[in-house]
Amino acid sequence: MVIGDWRKQVPASRFGGADRPGRIGGAREPTASWWGGRRVTRRGVEITLGVLWLVDGALQFQPSMFTRGFFVDMLGMANMGLPGPVSTVEYDLTSMLAAHPALWNALFAALQVALGAGLLWRRTARAALGLSILWALSVWIVGEGVGGLFMGGTNLLTGAPGAALLYALIAVTIWPRRASGGALGAPVSTGGGVPGAPVSTHGGVPGASASGGVGARAGRSVADEGVLGGALARWMWLLVWFGTAALELEPASHTPAAQLTTTGEGEPGAVAAVNHAIGGLFTGWDLPFVVVFAFLQVAVGVGVLAPRTRRPALAAGVALALATGLAGQDLGGLLTGNATDPGTGPVLALFAVTLWPRTAVGEALEAGPAAVPGGALAR
């Protein structure tokens, strides 16, 4: 049984250093993360992704989804602005799905529930993760019309680049890499610039070295353990935020006050009133809002490249994602009866979590009870 915080049970001398406050193994412990030093694991991200798919599947069972109008309206909106050949394919798919809406919707809803359940069960998680990538990309292209990127007025505030694309990016980011020994998902080190090198240990703590003590692996994230590696995952984050910032250059994106106000359409009266109030705050300030908003998005994207600014950039990204998800999208319009997902806000925040650098303590906790000498984590 895991007992609380192992730092309170094991004297620092057990790790080869003086028993001094704030130190482990003679080295100063890094500052705890913004969620209180709790573990951020690949499996935790995978489970969260599974919960999101379950939510999407549940939303797909809403009565309005089983009607012809749902497919005609949704795919008709997705078709706006698409290039000619793609638009033709989208139109043909709309006709096919609208012919038997109840059957197709039941299949889609069941598939999303199955993906979510599969991600929650370890034995099927890898297969479900792979299938979720294919389905998410299909939804992004067909159901969201490539995230609405060809339609004027699409930006971060209204849901760009599309929740489905972010589902796929997260799934690819946490896809387990194969260690040199052949074990899928085994811990690997990127220390010293050699991906796949075995993780060093000292004093029973993974990532410790004979000279540096605990913390040699600190700063690594869930993405670092994935098949893409942390560096490529961070560039993907940069591309997402640069892309949304570029969308602010469109003239149709220069009316944020109106976009915030119209978010309330179809919402209950109280929610719509809040949307109108938020939109009213920025009336007459559209251009300054767009400039500052675009600058913040660029800063969030660039900030992850430097270790020193990575945490602040990711924290700012989470704040922006949740703010736009709530004020700009009403969490995908969950209360309208027509929502298919909770919007891009929660998913973009989850992407940030996969990139969040762990502390040395988080690395030791991630390694499990065996990492602590004398079995201090177990009783």
What name fits each language-model region?
Residues 1-114, 121-379:
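Extended, low-polarity transmembrane helix blocks
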